[in-house]
């Protein structure tokens, strides 16, 4: 799995890892049942501490994106259609409000939605 981490950003590295895995799932690059790298392997590939990857995986588990089994490893979970969780709804509303306040037009936002849901 190829992650692009930017150590110059204010965004914590564990969160960059988490966000890129979520985007990979949304884009279909990571599919249900797919085995993810071990914490050690991903940490080595990214050049980060194992605790950083462990924190990202822990958050992904809490959010229901992945499952870890000591023998089977860490796999992407199947996601069924369901109601939008309130924290995601709030973040989405804030992001859309910020885009509108910044002068972004409706078509640009709709193009982004189509890109994610393609």
Where are each of the predicted segments found?
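Short loop/turn and capping residues at structural boundaries
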Residues: 35-36, 54, 71, 80, ...
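N-terminal helix-turn-helix
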Residues: 36-67
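Short, cationic-aromatic polyanion-contact patches
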Residues: 14, 72-88
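Beta-hairpin "wing" of winged helix-turn-helix
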Residues: 29-34, 61-71, 76-78
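Intrinsically disordered, low-complexity segments enriched in polar/charged small residues
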Residues: 23, 45, 60, 75-76, ...
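Short Asp/Glu-rich motifs
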Residues: 43-44, 79-80, 118
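Extreme N-terminal segment that seeds HTH/winged-HTH DNA-binding domains in transcriptional regulators
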Residues: 1-35, 41, 86-118
């Amino acid at each position: 799995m190829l992650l692009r981490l930017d150590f110059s950003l204010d965004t914590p590295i564990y969160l960059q890892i988490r966000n890129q895995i979520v985007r990979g799932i949304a884009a279909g690059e990571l599919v249900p049942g797919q085995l993810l790298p071990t914490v050690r392997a991903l940490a080595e590939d990214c050049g980060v501490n194992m605790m950083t990857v462990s924190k990202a995986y822990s958050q992904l588990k809490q959010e229901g994106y992945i499952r870890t089994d000591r023998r089977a490893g860490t796999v992407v979970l199947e996601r069924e259609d369901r109601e939008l969780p309130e924290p995601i709804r709030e973040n989405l509303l804030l992001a859309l409000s910020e885009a509108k306040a910044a002068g972004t037009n409706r078509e640009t936002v709709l193009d982004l939605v189509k890109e994610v849901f393609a």
